[in-house]
């Protein structure tokens, strides 16, 4: 099953997440099909907190991809801001 979820990157105590489309059987930070955005929970000042390619997210959801809870909240916030 294809899912859209967060893959953790960054340094210790400084998380940075990539929003990726992947097979649900792959490891959290493992192989992915496509990167559709990022989420920086520690963004401050002029730094960008979230960037999502909503067209690609809609494409994958249309093909039957499931969305994790956290990514669903990010999509909702991005739609509200746009």
From Swiss-Prot:
<comment type="similarity">
    <text>Belongs to the bacterial ribosomal protein bS16 family.</text>
</comment>
<keyword id="KW-0689">Ribosomal protein</keyword>
<dbReference type="InterPro" id="IPR000307">
    <property type="entry name" value="Ribosomal_bS16"/>
</dbReference>
<dbReference type="InterPro" id="IPR023803">
    <property type="entry name" value="Ribosomal_bS16_dom_sf"/>
</dbReference>
<dbReference type="InterPro" id="IPR020592">
    <property type="entry name" value="Ribosomal_bS16_CS"/>
</dbReference>
<dbReference type="Pfam" id="PF00886">
    <property type="entry name" value="Ribosomal_S16"/>
</dbReference>
<dbReference type="GO" id="GO:0006412">
    <property type="term" value="P:translation"/>
</dbReference>
<keyword id="KW-0687">Ribonucleoprotein</keyword>
<protein>
    <recommendedName>
        <fullName>Small ribosomal subunit protein bS16</fullName>
    </recommendedName>
</protein>
<dbReference type="GO" id="GO:0003735">
    <property type="term" value="F:structural constituent of ribosome"/>
</dbReference>
<dbReference type="GO" id="GO:0005737">
    <property type="term" value="C:cytoplasm"/>
</dbReference>
<dbReference type="GO" id="GO:0015935">
    <property type="term" value="C:small ribosomal subunit"/>
</dbReference>
């Amino acid at each position: 099953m294809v899912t859209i979820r967060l893959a953790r990157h960054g340094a210790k105590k400084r998380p940075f997440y990539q929003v990726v489309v992947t097979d649900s059987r792959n490891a959290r930070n493992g192989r992915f099909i496509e990167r559709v955005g990022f989420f920086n929970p520690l963004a401050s000042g002029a730094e960008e907190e979230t960037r999502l390619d909503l067209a690609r997210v809609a494409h994958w959801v249309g093909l039957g991809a499931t969305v994790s809870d956290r990514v669903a909240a990010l999509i909702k916030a991005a739609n509200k801001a746009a």
